[in-house]
């Protein structure tokens, strides 16, 4: 039986809410048959932060796994877990935010979330389906949607609120009128896309920086193998007797950033937590610092001549 790891946490802004610095991601299409077993095994290993979204097929089975974990005594109460979900683009309108969160809670059988994020800084008409049609793309009412997110927190539907895939410029729009500051900005980050400027901005504003795709999201529509095939990381992994994945995840963690890992393989789930009792040296960090940069999650789907973002440069405000 693998040992249970105690994962360090970070306090989110002035909320007093603590979030485990390594989370368990649940995005997969279609969801594997052993997903619930994977979640239960993750809890046994020590994972307490589970990341989902209304557009993922994992909300309901995650909720079922939490119920089972309580029944089995793997956790004593739901309060031991930190659950994040996200507002999808078809619900990113001021009057649809609260109903969308309530639907996510119903899907999971939960009374509250620990964190609720705006998934992406763009909207789709409520009737939109996948694949996305360019004519369905709409600009986001940042101020109105954020006010509705604030109401979610005031109502106790979520303990904290935040954003995902937001640039510094788009965060500035939120901050200009926000009564409750975003607790989190969850974005792509790994040794091949280090996000130094955005990290500095978030740190200055008291917004916790959280990383998805720490290994490059190989096998997804937006993923690439540039992390897993990186010679610098391979050399460091060999020298330290660690896997390349451990080097990449440790690097993110060592930046003071939380990281959402994703594997339903029991061995790799355990391996991804074996990052706390060793460090990357200043020399190793310097080598990683020099790796050529590449954004994997580019969002071309939401670029349109008639939409809010006519180019990728506009979408990412030059952060590309």
From Swiss-Prot:
Which reaction equations make up its catalytic activity? Answer: 7-acetyl-epi-neemfruitin B + AH2 + H2O = (1S,3bR,4R,5aR,9aR,9bR,11aS)-1-[(4R)-5-[(2S)-3,3-dimethyloxiran-2-yl]-1,4-dihydroxybutan-2-yl]-3b,6,6,9a,11a-pentamethyl-7-oxo-1H,2H,3bH,4H,5H,5aH,6H,7H,9aH,9bH,10H,11H,11aH-cyclopenta[a]phenanthren-4-yl acetate + acetate + A + H(+)
Q: Where is the signal peptide?
A: none
The residues the record assigns to binding NADP(+) are 51, 186, 264-272
- Which Pfam families does this chain map to? Aldo_ket_red
Q: Which UniProt keywords apply?
A: NADP, Oxidoreductase
EC numbers, comma separated: 1.1.1.-
Family affiliation: Belongs to the aldo/keto reductase family.
Q: What is this protein called?
A: 7-acetyl-epi-neemfruitin B aldo-keto reductase
């Amino acid at each position: 039986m693998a040992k249970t790891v105690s994962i360090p946490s970070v306090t989110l802004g002035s909320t007093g809410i603590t979030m485990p610095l390594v989370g368990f991601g649940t995005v997969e299409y279609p969801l594997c048959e052993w997903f619930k077993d994977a979640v239960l095994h993750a809890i046994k290993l020590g994972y307490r932060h589970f990341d989902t979204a209304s557009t993922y097929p994992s909300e309901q089975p995650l909720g079922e796994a939490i119920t089972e974990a309580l029944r089995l005594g793997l956790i004593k109460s739901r309060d031991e877990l930190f659950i994040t979900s996200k507002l999808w683009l078809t619900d990113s309108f001021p009057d649809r935010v609260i109903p969308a969160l309530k639907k996510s809670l119903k899907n999971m059988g939960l009374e509250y979330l620990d964190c609720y994020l705006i998934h992406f800084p763009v909207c789709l008409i409520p009737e939109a389906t996948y694949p996305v049609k360019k004519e369905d793309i709409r600009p986001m009412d940042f101020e109105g949607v954020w006010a509705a997110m604030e109401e979610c927190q005031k109502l106790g539907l979520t303990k904290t609120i935040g954003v995902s895939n937001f640039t510094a410029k788009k965060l500035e729009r939120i901050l200009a009128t926000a009564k409750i500051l975003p607790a989190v900005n969850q974005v792509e980050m790994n040794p091949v896309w280090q996000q130094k400027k955005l990290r500095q901005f978030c740190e200055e504003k008291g917004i916790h920086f959280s990383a998805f795709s720490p290994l490059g999201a190989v096998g997804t529509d937006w993923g690439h193998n540039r992390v897993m095939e990186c010679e610098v990381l391979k050399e460091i992994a060999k020298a330290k007797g660690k896997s390349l994945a451990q080097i990449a995840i440790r690097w993110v963690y060592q930046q003071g950033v939380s990281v959402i890992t994703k594997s339903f393989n029991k061995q790799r789930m355990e391996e991804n937590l074996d990052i706390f009792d060793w460090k990357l040296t200043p020399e190793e960090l310097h080598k990683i610092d020099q790796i050529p940069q590449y954004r994997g999650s580019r969002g071309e789907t939401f670029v349109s001549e008639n939409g809010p973002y006519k180019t990728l440069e506009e979408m990412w405000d030059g952060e590309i």
